[in-house]
Design a protein with these regions (language model features):
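Paired small-residue
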Residues: 91, 102-110, 299-307
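Helix-to-loop junctions at the C-terminal end of transmembrane segments
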Residues: 64-77, 261-273, 357
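A late C-terminal transmembrane helix in Major Facilitator Superfamily
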Residues: 326-362, 369
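Helix-breaking motifs and short loop linkers at transmembrane-helix boundaries and internal kinks
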Residues: 44, 76, 97-103, 294-296
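Cytoplasmic helix-loop-helix junction between adjacent transmembrane helices
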Residues: 107-145
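Conserved MFS/SLC helix-loop-helix module at the cytosolic interface between two early adjacent transmembrane helices
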Residues: 63-99
Length: 392
């Protein structure tokens, strides 16, 4: 049972402020993807070097997720979360005014700290803001910020970059960060911390029954998804054979469906968490194998990809909810482990997917991706049954 929310009204305004923070963080994370060419030209570096701005953020986020709970164990979580939003603003300003590559990387490193830290503490913070039965709904609200940012960051960054320049785009991102900071300042309550948490707590949490298997299953799902997502464009080009407009429409459909999926996830998890955890990767696995087997019909492919997007939208909400119910006493440490597992899965899924793509093309990637997702569903069904049942 969550100790604060049982005695006080749900702090939905604070949850909304965290959603704004998520939107700002994820938007800033992916802006360089659509601005690589002008950034590289302006800083007199290659596009490959500019791309390291994304890599640096992900790497620092992974390390931060493992260390931040112990490093800030004596600090009120209100101030820690405000610090992350402050780092978001500073990061975007450093990038906007960066005269060279080191300055750019410094800004992106600060963003990685904010990103990894925020995700580590998000589930534990939600537990303090709303009653236990409202946690899935609150998490779905927060993850909707991810979906919106994913939809708008790249196209809007590219669009405004052409009109006002890439530096001004990052200045706008800094304004969004400042807005999130101000709303959080007005709405986040004081939240005491667990001063007993140490770095070794990570290992203690990992040794609890079924936690390790849960992290493995989550990593498999994210690896399978990002192997698919990384190579979706080559699939649409070579198998579905759509033009640029068709591709944009399909990807927009994926993003919109993903946004709806975050709210669907909250609805389903409030009714049956374990069933949701099993059905979603199983559905994604079937869709991956279906695209590999019968892909090539634009309308059918678009429908399956949209359904994949909606299904995946429930996944982050599901695993964050699982975390709050399985390790409620050390939700921050468990959150750090989950973030690290997901970041590693994203990197490994894309990397292994590249090897498979070179050998068997996009169809090969989708076949392996679908198989991994089905294995993850089986692992949850047979390996995590007792713990999840107890948690629900």
């Amino acid at each position: 049972m969550n100790d604060v929310s049982q005695r006080t009204p749900p702090a939905w305004s604070a949850v909304f402020s965290m959603t704004l923070g998520v939107f700002g963080l994820v938007t800033a994370e992916f802006l360089p993807v659509s601005l690589l060419t002008p950034m590289a030209a302006d800083l007199a570096i290659t596009e490959g070097m500019a791309g390291q701005a994304v890599t640096a953020t992900a790497a620092v986020a992974l390390v931060t997720s493992l260390l931040i709970t112990a490093a800030t164990r004596r600090i009120d979580r209100r101030y820690v979360l405000l610090a992350f939003s402050g780092l978001l603003v500073i990061s975007n300003l450093l990038v906007a005014y960066a005269p060279n590559m080191p300055s750019l990387l410094l800004g992106r490193v600060l963003l990685g700290v904010a990103l990894g830290g925020f995700w580590t503490m998000s589930a534990a913070t939600v537990m303090r803001l709303v009653p236990e039965d409202s946690v899935p709904r609150a998490l779905s609200m927060i993850f909707s910020g991810v979906s919106v940012a994913t939809i708008v960051a790249a196209p809007m960054g590219s669009f405004f970059g052409e009109i006002i320049g890439w530096r001004n785009v990052f200045l706008i991102a800094a304004l969004f960060g400042a807005l999130a900071f101000l709303v959080q300042l007005a709405t986040l309550p004081r939240m005491a911390t667990n001063a007993r948490t140490r770095l070794k707590t990570l290992f203690e949490v990992l040794q609890r029954p079924m936690v390790g298997l849960g992290m493995l299953a989550a990593a498999m799902i994210f690896a399978g998804h990002f192997a698919f997502f990384t190579y979706i464009r080559p699939f649409l080009e070579t198998v579905t054979r759509v033009d640029v407009n068709g591709m944009s429409s399909i990807l927009l459909g994926f993003g919109l469906a993903n946004f709806l999926g975050t709210f669907l996830g909250g609805f389903m998890l409030e009714r049956n968490m374990r069933l949701t955890q099993i059905v979603m990767p199983a559905t994604m696995g079937i869709l991956g194998l279906g695209l590999a087997g019968v892909g090539g019909v634009p309308l059918l492919d678009a429908m399956m990809i949209a359904l994949w997007g909606m299904t995946f939208g429930t996944v982050p909400v599901a695993w964050s909810t699982w975390l709050t119910r399985t390790v409620p006493d050390e939700a921050e440490s468990a959150g750090g482990l989950l973030v690290a597992a997901i970041q590693f899965a994203i990197a490994s899924g894309a990397a292994v997917g590249g090897l498979i793509f070179d050998a068997g093309g996009a169809i090969g990637v989708f076949m392996v991706s679908g198989s991994v997702l089905l294995l993850a569903a089986l692992l949850i069904l047979f390996g995590i049954k007792a713990q999840t049942a107890a948690a629900t």
